[in-house]
């Protein structure tokens, strides 16, 4: 006994393998059973009880050894509880042993039984066992010896067989049943072997004991409540779920509870008989299988949540079972289509049902079922919130899988709806067939825009909508706040926006505000994609406040709702692969990045709620908007202010796509500003849901033209246009306060614009100063989204830019305020240093990279401030790999590459057939290269090996093509010149390097470097003619970053990309065209 005490603390229960725990439990049960068994064999066994107990102790050494302790130790990290349990168990077992040791006990099993009963009575006298003790005594007095023996055998692990105790939840089998099964079990086992305790029985006892003791034990006396709780969950996790989890391995019969399974196994004999071997063998033999069975039960619990037939809700233990089921029942054909409607009726609260009914009927006459759709989606949302089956605690929803069904059914009418005619369908196949037959899939975009226009313009609907107050939660994209109101305060814009939303939706008048909002979102989503300039004209904007309906407002409303909807992930439209696709404007130069969406446009407008990323994005966008703001303010502080403002007003997002459209128009404008604006829209999109923006951009642009007052449509709510953020146009920028952001929007967006607008906008004159170009672009963009801010005549000029093209977005500011642009022009007018712009662009880039799931601007934007003419090597050092373009730009020093390429070319050997054979560079050459370049020998070897691999595999690499054909073409990475022979190629590279390869081994490093510097000027001049294989023979091009000259635009682009990590689109900014002398 003392030995047991000493050893108990050695291992905390938490660290004892489950198998040992279980084995120990079984052993202990056997030990206690020995005294309780009625068999004569058992009486003999009792003679050896002490030795047996000692043996068992070897298994019980760990604190878990005691049955109770075992349970407690199942997952308990507390060694104290284990020790406590071990000690307790030790004392109890000591008592047990002492009793059986009496000679009487040997010959009189009944006596020993009585003694053991007494021992257990004492043991149960503990407060925690009070109810168990009562049960024990009751059953002891009322049951037969068989029952008594069974009860006591299970007592150590209070098991259900004791009827009263077994009344725990699902395992409450009637006392007679459990007792009888246990009795038969124990008798069977006892006859087969002295220790015969069936592991099924043990498992059952353990389970029941845990459930009962969990309720009984207020303190962690025998079991740790934590352990019990955890184990209880593991064993019973699905007992109450109705999923048949306990399966008989022999016949696959499924039972809801372990008790039923155990009874079945006992009655049918579907279990292994070898589990009744002697204790030592038994423990070893069954420890793994028992552990495995328990682990299976636990794993299956999780698996069944996934391996569930979505039609009938049956759970399966394996994917194979589920597959067989689906194949045999053909349920896989019915899953998304015919789901049990009863599930919906059961699960949807009556109030929800009523709401659904109420909402559906009022469908407004407009697009058939639109109102209904909105109502449905709204009610579906409510259901989602109210549905008791979808609580956070019950993530898996209705146990039989009906949750999927009812959720789908509840929204089916909304989901499976034709966006053209509004007809709902029962199945996706039907909807698809309908779209194909009617050709509505082609008309969706245009018809949606028409509908959107109708909705917007219908005065009756407008009035109705206006009559319904929308909660400020609707996205306050209001920056485009109603044109009439043109509220300067974000609150005002919010209100107007709310109004707009309903107006545009002009869905069921009767529906509650939420319903309308939902509908508006739906309709927005549907219409926005199609609401293009063709439908909304500037003329429309002029009479915009028709019947009290403000087109701009409604547009804003629509966009905001769409954005919020997109954000919430409840798409109501049907025919688009993605939100972005749904809202891409045909006129926009580039689709908004899907990532943009993630930046929330949500009801953060309410104010600070807006997520930081969104706010930051907005801030970034803002900066463009506030071109006028003083550049002297520190970039960081300015950005912070912008972020704050943006956070305060989510309207920024409302700006929507207009910026996108502006993008395209800007591109045409060819002014750098256009570029900037373009970028803005992208950024905005990133922050705000692009999907909404797109449509709003379209409609918003049109609206903007009409009621500039609604400048908010830009998303700069009332921005107060003080700053007349030309970028407001990028309106997304800011819903933020009318105060202009202090960062020059041009500088903040320059990098972004450069990246995205380079292709779209062709500067009027390539030689035009980049700042001037940006200015123009921003002006054009600004005038479009002009917020009713400072009136600027520039807006007119911009209008010209944009409106020359019918594709250009409508100038929403045209009809109302044109002053907006002026301030922007002023701000732009003050020339900003290119380096300053770059710094800001870096800031923007960092922010966008961090905030937006996917920055709308390519990483190439990360153009560090290389503008100050630092050498290309320095520029390379400054550019972190993160900022570099991965595919086309390498981290290699261009000079090192030239040396390696020249050496490799010199190592090629020409055969008599005219083909070239690659021969390796000798160690000496490698050493020379290493000494000169500072590259390690390993790096050089890797480079050579990579080149050889590429040549063998594809016959070419970056600087050498067609080697395998016998007609190799060598390319100069620096100037893009092509050469047919290795010798001319090497000599050309040497002109770049400023020294001969032969000198590499002879000249000291410092001398070579000096020679390089001296020859650099000559090289630049001579390279012109050498590399001028392209069209521009009349001029040379100089890289502003490193002052090198090149013979062609292509060469400069290559150089910018490879050496400086700049996008070729940026060549206008970093390249100077020089007349040849």
From Swiss-Prot:
**A GO MF label:** zinc ion binding
Alphabetical keyword list: Developmental protein, DNA-binding, Homeobox, Metal-binding, Nucleus, Phosphoprotein, Repeat, Repressor, Transcription, Transcription regulation, Zinc, Zinc-finger
Gene Ontology cellular-component annotations: chromatin; nucleus
Give its localization: Nucleus
Start-end of Basic and acidic residues biased regions = 269-284, 496-528, 647-665, 675-708
List GO BP terms, alphabetically. Answer: anterior/posterior pattern specification; middle ear morphogenesis; regulation of transcription by RNA polymerase II; soft palate development
Q: Where are the zinc fingers (C2H2-type)?
A: 246-270, 307-331, 416-440, 970-992, 1037-1060
Q: Look up keyword Kinase and say if it applies.
A: no
Phosphoserine PTM positions read 765
- Where are the compositionally biased (Acidic residues) regions? 26-36
Q: Which residues bind DNA?
A: 885-955
Q: Where is the composition biased (Low complexity)?
A: 164-195
Q: Where does the entry say this protein is expressed, by tissue?
A: Expressed in brain; strongly reduced in post-mortem elderly subjects with Alzheimer disease.
**Alphabetized SMART domains for the sequence:** HOX, ZnF_C2H2
Ranges of Polar residues compositional bias?
Answer: 57-71, 139-152, 853-862
Q: Which InterPro entries match?
A: HD, Teashirt_fam, Znf_C2H2_type
Q: In the UniProt record, does the keyword Calcium occur?
A: no
Q: Which CDD domains match?
A: homeodomain (cd00086)
Region annotation Disordered: where it falls in the sequence: 1-109, 139-195, 269-298, 467-549, 647-720, 848-873
Subunit text: Interacts (via homeobox domain) with APBB1 (via PID domain 1).
**What does the function comment of this entry state?**
Probable transcriptional regulator involved in developmental processes. May act as a transcriptional repressor (Potential).
The entry sums up its family as follows: Belongs to the teashirt C2H2-type zinc-finger protein family.
> What disease is linked with this protein in Swiss-Prot or TrEMBL?
Aural atresia, congenital: A rare anomaly of the ear that involves some degree of failure of the development of the external auditory canal. The malformation can also involve the tympanic membrane, ossicles and middle ear space. The inner ear development is most often normal. Different CAA forms are known. CAA type I is characterized by bony or fibrous atresia of the lateral part of the external auditory canal and an almost normal medial part and middle ear. CAA type II is the most frequent type and is characterized by partial or total aplasia of the external auditory canal.
The molecule here is called Teashirt homolog 1
């Amino acid at each position: 006994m003392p030995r047991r005490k000493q050893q108990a603390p050695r291992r905390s229960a938490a660290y004892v393998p489950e198998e040992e725990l279980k084995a120990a439990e079984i052993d202990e049960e056997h030990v206690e059973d020995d005294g309780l068994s009625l068999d004569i064999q058992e009486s003999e066994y009792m003679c050896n009880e002490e030795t047996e107990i000692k043996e068992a102790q070897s298994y019980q050494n760990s604190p878990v050894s005691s049955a109770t302790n075992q349970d407690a130790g199942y997952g308990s990290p507390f060694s104290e509880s284990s020790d406590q349990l071990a000690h307790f168990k030790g004392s109890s077992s000591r008592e047990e042993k002492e009793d059986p040791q009496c000679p009487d006990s040997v010959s009189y099993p009944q006596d020993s039984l009585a003694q053991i009963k007494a021992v257990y009575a004492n043991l149960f006298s503990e407060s925690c066992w009070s109810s168990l003790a009562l049960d024990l005594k009751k059953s002891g007095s009322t049951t037969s010896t068989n029952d008594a023996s069974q009860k006591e055998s299970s007592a150590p692990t209070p098991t259900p067989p004791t009827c009263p105790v077994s009344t725990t939840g699902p395992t409450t089998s009637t006392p007679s049943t459990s007792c009888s099964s246990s009795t038969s079990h124990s008798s069977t086992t006892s006859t087969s072997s002295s220790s015969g305790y069936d592991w099924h029985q043990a498992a059952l006892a353990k389970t029941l004991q845990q459930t009962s003791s969990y309720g009984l034990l207020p303190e962690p006396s025998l079991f740790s409540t934590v352990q019990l709780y955890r184990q209880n969950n593991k064993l019973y996790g699905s007992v109450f779920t109705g999923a048949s989890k306990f399966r008989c391995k022999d016949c696959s019969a499924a039972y809801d509870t372990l008790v039923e399974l155990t009874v079945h196994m006992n009655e049918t004999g579907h279990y292994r008989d070898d589990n009744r071997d002697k204790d030592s063998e038994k423990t070893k033999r069954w420890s793994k299988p028992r552990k495995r069975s328990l682990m299976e039960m636990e794993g299956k619990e999780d698996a069944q949540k996934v391996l569930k037939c979505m039609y009938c809700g049956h759970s399966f233990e394996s994917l194979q079972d589920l597959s067989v089921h689906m194949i045999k029942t053909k349920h896989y054909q019915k899953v998304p289509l015919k789901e049990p409607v009863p599930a919906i009726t059961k699960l949807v609260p009556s109030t929800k049902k009523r709401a659904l009914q109420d909402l559906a009927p009022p469908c407004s006459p407009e697009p058939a079922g639109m109102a209904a759709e909105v109502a449905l989606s709204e009610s579906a949302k409510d259901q989602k919130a109210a549905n008791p089956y979808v609580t956070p605690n019950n993530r898996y929803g209705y146990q039989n899988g009906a949750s999927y069904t009812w959720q789908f059914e509840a929204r089916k009418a909304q989901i499976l709806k034709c966006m053209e005619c509004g007809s709902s369908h029962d199945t996706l196949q039907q909807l698809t067939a309908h779209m194909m037959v009617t050709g509505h899939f082609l008309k969706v975009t245009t018809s949606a825009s028409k509908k959107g226009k109708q909705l917007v313009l219908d005065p009756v609907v407008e009035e109705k909508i206006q009559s319904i107050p929308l909660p400020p939660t609707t996205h306050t994209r209001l920056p485009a706040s109603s044109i009439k109101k043109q509220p300067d305060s974000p609150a005002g814009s919010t209100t107007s926006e709310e109004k707009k939303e309903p107006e545009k939706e002009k869905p069921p008048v009767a529906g509650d505000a939420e319903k309308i909002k939902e509908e508006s979102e739906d309709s927005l989503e549907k219409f926005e994609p199609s609401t293009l300039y063709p439908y909304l004209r500037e003329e429309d904007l002029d009479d915009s406040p028709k019947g009290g309906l403000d087109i701009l407002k409604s547009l804003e409303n629509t966009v905001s709702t769409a954005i919020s909807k997109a954000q919430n992930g409840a798409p109501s439209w049907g025919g688009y692969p993605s939100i972005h696709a749904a809202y891409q404007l045909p006129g926009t130069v580039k689709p908004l990045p899907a990532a943009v969406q993630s930046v929330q446009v949500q009801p953060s407008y309410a104010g600070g709620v807006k997520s930081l990323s969104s706010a930051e994005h907005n801030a970034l966008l803002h900066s463009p908007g506030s071109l006028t703001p003083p550049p002297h303010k520190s970039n960081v502080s300015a950005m912070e202010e912008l972020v704050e403002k943006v956070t305060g007003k989510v309207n920024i997002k409302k700006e929507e796509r207009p910026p996108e459209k502006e993008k395209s128009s800007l591109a045409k404008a060819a002014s750098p500003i256009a570029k900037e604006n373009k970028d803005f829209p992208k950024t905005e999109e990133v922050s705000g849901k692009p999907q909404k923006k797109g449509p709003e951009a379209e409609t918003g642009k049109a609206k903007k033209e009409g009621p500039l007052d609604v400048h908010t449509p830009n998303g700069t709510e009332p921005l107060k246009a003080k700053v007349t953020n030309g970028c407001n146009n990028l309106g997304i920028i800011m819903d933020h306060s009318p105060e202009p952001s202090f960062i020059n929007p041009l500088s903040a967006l320059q990098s972004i614009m450069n990246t995205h607008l380079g292709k779209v906008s062709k500067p009027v004159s390539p030689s035009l100063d980049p700042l001037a170009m940006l200015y123009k672009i921003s002006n054009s963009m600004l005038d479009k989204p002009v917020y009713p801010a400072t009136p600027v005549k520039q807006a007119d000029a911009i209008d010209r830019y944009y409106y020359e093209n019918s594709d250009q977005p409508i100038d929403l500011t045209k009809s109302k305020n044109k002053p907006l642009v002026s301030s922007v022009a002023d701000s732009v007018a003050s020339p900003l240093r290119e380096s300053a712009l770059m710094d800001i662009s870096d800031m923007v880039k960092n922010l966008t990279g961090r905030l937006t799931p996917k920055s709308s601007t390519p990483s190439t934007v990360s153009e560090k401030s290389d503008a100050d003419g630092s050498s290309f090597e320095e520029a390379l050092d400054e550019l972190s790999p993160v900022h570099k373009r991965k595919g086309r730009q390498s981290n290699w020093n261009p000079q090192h590459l030239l040396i390696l390429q020249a050496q490799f070319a010199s190592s090629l050997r020409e055969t008599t057939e005219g083909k070239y054979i690659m021969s390796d560079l000798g160690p000496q050459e490698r050493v020379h290269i290493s000494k000169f370049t500072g590259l390690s020998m390993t790096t050089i070897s890797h480079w050579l090996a990579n080149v050889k691999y590429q040549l063998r595999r594809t016959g070419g690499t970056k600087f050498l093509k067609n080697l395998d054909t016998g007609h190799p073409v060598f390319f100069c990475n620096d100037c893009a010149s092509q050469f047919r022979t290795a010798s001319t190629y090497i000599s050309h590279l040497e002109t770049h390097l400023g020294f001969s390869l032969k000198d590499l081994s002879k000249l000291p490093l410092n001398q070579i470097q000096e020679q390089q510097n001296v020859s650099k000027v000559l090289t630049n001049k001579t390279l012109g003619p050498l590399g001028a294989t392209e069209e521009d023979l009349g001029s040379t091009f100089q890289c502003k970053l490193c002052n090198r000259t090149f013979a062609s635009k292509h060469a400069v682009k290559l150089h910018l990309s490879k050496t400086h990590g700049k996008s070729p689109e940026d060549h206008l900014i970093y390249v100077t065209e020089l007349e040849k002398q």
